[in-house]
Amino acid sequence: MLHSHTYRDMKSYDYSAANVRYEFLPSDASQLYQLFNKSHGVDVTIPPEQNLHNWVDPESPYFQAEIRDAIFSYEARSQKSERLKVCISTREMDEAAWKYAHHSQVILDGTFGVCSSRLLLFIAMGIDEQGKGVPLALFLFSAPTGNQATHAGYNREILRELLDKWKTHLSKGRDTIFCPYVAITDTDTKERGALQDVWPDIWLLLCRFHLRQCWTNQRKKILSGKVS
C-alpha cells in the first residue's frame, strides 16, 4: 500500500516536502488485512482451500493463470478423510533447482505456523553462488482430520509422495533424471527417510544448528538428572 500510495491522503501531498507520520491503532491491523485480502481476491468468508480451487479452476470467475502455472501438483480436499495437497514451483524455481541442486545439495525443512488453518509447509532450497538460500519448491498440505497437533500431521509417506512428484515434474521432457547428491535436514527421521525413498543414493547430512540444539537439550536433561 505504500508503493501504490493508497493510504489516506498519500496522493494529495508533495513527497519532496512531506513530513508525515502514520499512527497505527490496534484496530487498523484487521482493516489492513481485509483491504489486502480484497485487493488479492481472497474471500475470507469461505475456507482457504475453496479460494485456492477458485484460482486454479479455469471455469471459475476468479481463475488466475499465474497461480495455476506455478502449481505442478494439486489435489483438492473434497472429503474430510482427504488431504489438501499443493506443490508450487515457478519456472524460475525449476531453473534454479537444476542449477543449484541437481548433482549438488538440497535443503529440506518444514514449518507449521504458516496460517490459522491446519496446514503444513515444507520448503526445498538450494544454495547460490553467494552462499544464500534459494527456494526451489514449496509443498503445502493439510493435516489429517482429527489430528490434534498440526506439527504431527505428516509422515514419511506424504513427504515421499510430494518429493517424488517434484522429481517427476523436474525430469519431465529431459534426458536426465533430477537427482541431488546431498541433502541437509534437521533430525526428523521422516524427512530423511522420504528423501532416501526418492533418491536411494543420496547422502544425508544433519543441519549444524539442529545438531547443536539436540546436544544442548540432551546435556541439560543429563545434568538435571531427568534422564532415566
Model-assigned labels for residue ranges:
Residues 1-228:
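DNA-binding interface regions
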